Amino acid sequence: MKLTLEPAPRCLHEYVSQLLEDWQPECLSCEYSHGGSSRPSLHDLFDLELENSRSPSPLLCDWCAEADSESTISTETDVGFTLNTPPVSPLPSYSTSPASIPEDMLLCLEEMPTFDDGDEVRSATTSFESRREKNFDPHVGSFFGCLRCAYYQEQGENSICGLCYLKALAEGKIF
């Protein structure tokens, strides 16, 4: 493998100008002068004429001009388009007061001793506190977590919810 080193350019401006000429895309015509006396201004480089915006630019190749004309046609069709939306109706007010909701309905399920008899998920012998005292091992199937996790673990699944997983991870029970 042979490496060739080019000497450092004497004038950075001339070097960059030469690179721009070498790498110039074929569809753009650059009128940048090499002389250091008259540098183009930003207005000269990015001069936009709004009067002739519908005609394709003479600086673009055929494919670019066609794509540009398609984009202007699609925006011209949207100019007169307005969307009529129906007015938003106000939200209905509910006559429930905070006093009508019992306080035990606002408690977290983890703090409740048991469900009602009709909705019993776990028995009195398998209380939530006794499950929490056992060490968590997902491969053995010991119970851990909230009531939802306990229900599925009683069904034979070795799963816990995301919140209980994070709690167990924070307590160091999952490595």
Curated annotation (Swiss-Prot):
Traced from the root, the source organism's taxonomic lineage reads: Viruses, Varidnaviria, Bamfordvirae, Preplasmiviricota, Tectiliviricetes
GO cellular component entries: host cell nucleus
Region Interaction with RB1 in competition with E2F1: start and end of each range?
40-48
| GO terms, molecular function | zinc ion binding
Please give the subunit comment from the record. Answer: Interacts with host UBE2I; this interaction interferes with polySUMOylation. Interacts with host RB1; this interaction induces the aberrant dissociation of RB1-E2F1 complex thereby disrupting the activity of RB1 and activating E2F1-regulated genes. Interacts with host ATF7; the interaction enhances ATF7-mediated viral transactivation activity which requires the zinc binding domains of both proteins.
Q: Which family does it belong to?
A: Belongs to the adenoviridae E1A protein family.
Q: Which InterPro entries match?
A: Aden_E1A
Query: What's this protein's function?
Result: Plays a role in viral genome replication by driving entry of quiescent cells into the cell cycle. Stimulation of progression from G1 to S phase allows the virus to efficiently use the cellular DNA replicating machinery to achieve viral genome replication. E1A protein has both transforming and trans-activating activities. Induces the disassembly of the E2F1 transcription factor from RB1 by direct competition for the same binding site on RB1, with subsequent transcriptional activation of E2F1-regulated S-phase genes and of the E2 region of the adenoviral genome.
Motif LXCXE motif, interaction with host RB1: positions: 106-110
Species in which this protein is naturally found? Canine adenovirus serotype 1 (strain Glaxo)
Q: Does the keyword Zinc-finger apply?
A: yes
Q: Does Zinc-finger show up as a keyword for this record?
A: yes
- Principal location: host cell
Chain segments annotated as coiled-coil in the UniProt record: none
| ZnF bounds (unnamed) | 146-164
**BP-aspect Gene Ontology terms:** regulation of DNA-templated transcription; symbiont-mediated perturbation of host cell cycle G1/S transition checkpoint; symbiont-mediated suppression of host innate immune response; symbiont-mediated suppression of host JAK-STAT cascade via inhibition of STAT1 activity; symbiont-mediated suppression of host type I interferon-mediated signaling pathway
Q: Which domain of life is it from?
A: Viruses
**Where is it localised?**
Host nucleus
UniProt KW keywords: Activator, Early protein, G1/S host cell cycle checkpoint dysregulation by virus, Host nucleus, Host-virus interaction, Inhibition of host innate immune response by virus, Inhibition of host interferon signaling pathway by virus, Inhibition of host STAT1 by virus, Interferon antiviral system evasion, Metal-binding, Modulation of host cell cycle by virus, Transcription, Transcription regulation, Viral immunoevasion, Zinc, Zinc-finger
User: Membrane-spanning residues where?
Assistant: none
Record protein name field: Early E1A protein
